[in-house]
């Protein structure tokens, strides 16, 4: 409010404001989730609900929306490979920083590493992906995501069908990158290529199935503040954990 008149934040030309706002909302949810994680595992404040199914559902909701939306937005722009390199490098930075300063909360193959890899693979394979009808690609990607979802438990399957995978697949860091992590593997944030690449591709094909003409309704902003966060999600993601940790550390000293 300035001089009695309200001002609205401008949405950059060409942006689909509601997509930015959805990403911003998911980012806020993720920040709150990570704040709870820090309180539990770094500051010893136990929360039964967070350790149980409600916390699990919250975490899955955040990552499903984030990855599906990233896949949906992948066809925007003409520099998917460049974006993939940038996001992958940001993931490598997170890994390096956590290994040095927070080895107990280290992040190996986290969401940024995954998203960067998914963008690079999609950019390379896009000539082939474009040959698949969007509705078919969406359906196949969704089914493959469901089939591969339990890969971390040692099997794949759907409904009554279940195929146990050989334990030799779950061998080392290399196999963990693809989704087959051994028992000794630990990461505070982990997304292997399987099953999450198929969720990313489901978003990619959902974009193609919807079409740009039907997306015009998404240009109208509802909450510009969330839109700003969505447009700067990579920077905010890199900064949020140090800020949250600093705030919680200060609170611990003040209220000790």
Regions found by a protein language model. Give the residues of each.
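Alpha-helical transmembrane segments and their immediate juxtamembrane cytosolic regions
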Residues: 1-256
């Amino acid at each position: 409010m300035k001089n009695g008149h309200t001002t609205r934040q401008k949405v950059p030309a060409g942006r689909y404001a509601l997509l930015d706002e959805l990403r911003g909302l998911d980012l806020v949810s993720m920040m709150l989730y990570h704040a709870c994680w820090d309180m539990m595992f770094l500051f010893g404040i136990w929360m039964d609900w967070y350790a149980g199914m409600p916390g699990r559902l919250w975490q899955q909701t955040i990552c499903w929306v984030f990855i599906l939306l990233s896949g949906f937005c992948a066809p925007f722009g003409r520099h998917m490979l460049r974006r993939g390199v940038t996001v992958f490098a940001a993931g490598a930075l997170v890994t390096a920083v956590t290994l040095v300063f927070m080895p107990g909360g280290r992040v190996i193959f986290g969401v940024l590493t995954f998203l960067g890899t998914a963008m690079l693979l999609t950019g390379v394979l896009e000539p082939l992906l474009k040959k698949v009808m969007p509705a078919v690609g969406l359906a196949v990607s969704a089914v493959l995501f469901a089939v591969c979802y339990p890969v971390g438990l040692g099997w794949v399957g759907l409904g009554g069908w279940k195929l146990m995978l050989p334990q030799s697949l779950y061998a080392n860091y290399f196999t963990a990158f693809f989704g087959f992590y051994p028992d000794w593997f630990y990461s505070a944030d982990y997304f292997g290529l399987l099953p999450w690449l198929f969720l990313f591709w489901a978003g990619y094909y959902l974009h193609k199935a919807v079409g740009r003409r039907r997306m015009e309704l998404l240009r109208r902003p509802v909450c510009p503040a969330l839109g700003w966060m969505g447009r700067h999600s990579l920077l905010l993601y890199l900064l949020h954990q140090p800020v949250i940790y600093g705030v919680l550390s200060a609170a611990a000293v003040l209220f000790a």
